[in-house]
């Protein structure tokens, strides 16, 4: 059975990941929030930077946009039925996320669970660094673990069929980009 979870390695190049990581390391981070816009560390414990891809003055947005558009088109070629549900367009708001050792998104969730995200068809996430001790994403319904590898992009359906959670690393920092 197909799981519709696609992996695109090297969707961001090493230099692009390093540029974005440097941006994260010099930015002001805020505690991560969950779908009710509240900090609930027992569900999601992270440091975030919310950004808007429409701000073309930010080079991080330009890097992300160029790669995301390319791979959304790849995904649509592999799964043309996705546009028959609802023409798929990206939401320009996304998060740069930093999970320090011991932090993570602990609770199983899907990506169209709130009123704000109820029309979401697909979900995406880039890994900015390789994490060898945890840091993975676990899709429960498929018993599938996706490794956090620098430059890797995941695209998957946003629905209840794709409940997932982070696997916490207790020794390494995980850096990622994900829609919100």
Protein language model regions, located:
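Fe(II)/2-oxoglutarate oxygenase catalytic core
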Residues: 1-155, 159-178
